[in-house]
Amino acid sequence: YYHGNEALHGIVRPGEFTVFPQAIGLAATWNPGLIFEVSSAISDEARGRWKELDYGKKQIAGASDLLTFWSPTVNMARDPRWGRTPETYGEDPFLTGVIGCEFVKGLQGDHPRYLKTVSTPKHFAVNNEEHNRSSCNAKMSERDLREFYLPSFERCIVDAKAQSIMMAYNAVNGVPCTVNTYLIKNVLRGDWGFNGYIVSDCSAPEWMVTKHKYVRDLDAAATLAIKAGLDLECGDRVYTAPLLKAYNESMVSKTDIDSAAYRVLRGRMLLGLFDDPSQNPYNQIEPSVIGCKKHQELALETARQSMVLLKNQKNFLPLNLKKVKSIAVVGINAGHCEFGDYSGIPKNAPVSVLDGIRKYAEKANVEVVYAPWV
């Protein structure tokens, strides 16, 4: 089982799925109920493809599995120069917490025994810096953490019961998040009662050696990480031979490893992966749900609600074709469908801004002039 697919606004792989508006657009709807519908549709499509692949038996070896998603991104967007800003729900911790909470609930479902999928909120914590993003140190007061950076994660863990969480690349107050016992043991396990499993961001454990310069070698990284409570590595450089060496040299105990393995395997058990498929009602979701008309209509409605009008000189919008003779559409992005970070292959046919305007204008024979460059 390969942990780690993406479902930020639709499933990324394998195959075609319904693509919904980018995360920052989902937040712009200000509609938590709608976001629950979106993530429920996403998890339905995951189960549909899972059944199509004979519950994983026909899946390509080494490919990301369909039932564990590294979503949503509930970091605070403080600087638009940060490349992952579109993955977030914006700069407000309350809105992000509410939207993130509903997204987690929709992904995981409400069955008393089984999870529909595993949701993994990320990146914990204080991760919103582009410069030296893999090794920077966020110096934070307790108040800044508790009032601004942590509330969105708390909602996802405490209220929505997310069963996994991803640690961030950066350090907080001098300690890389990968091994930050304050965040892992005090906040997550202690204050919030988190009982799921904790995964690193990709390559983060080895970067404690090469980028943070926090430990001397991979053996030390493995020792520090497993003892801090990191259950799963995204990658295969540290929790492999280095961890085995650390165990053989009595740097880590069998209990350390067993505890991590227990939490990871518990997540798979909650998905029903060790049970007869017929016992899990989510396994009855048919592949026909993928890209179905209902989901395409939901994507369209979400796109409509996600729109933000920044400027409207002389009340030009909405377009009144009785008063307009020609329309100029300027900019290369108007003729190109850009779905955003972590986009899958769309089952639904994309419509660009230019295509939409042309289709609307042709009703009244209004000329549309397109200039990709000015």
Regions found by a protein language model. Name each.
Residues 1-374:
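Glycoside hydrolase catalytic-domain context in secreted enzymes
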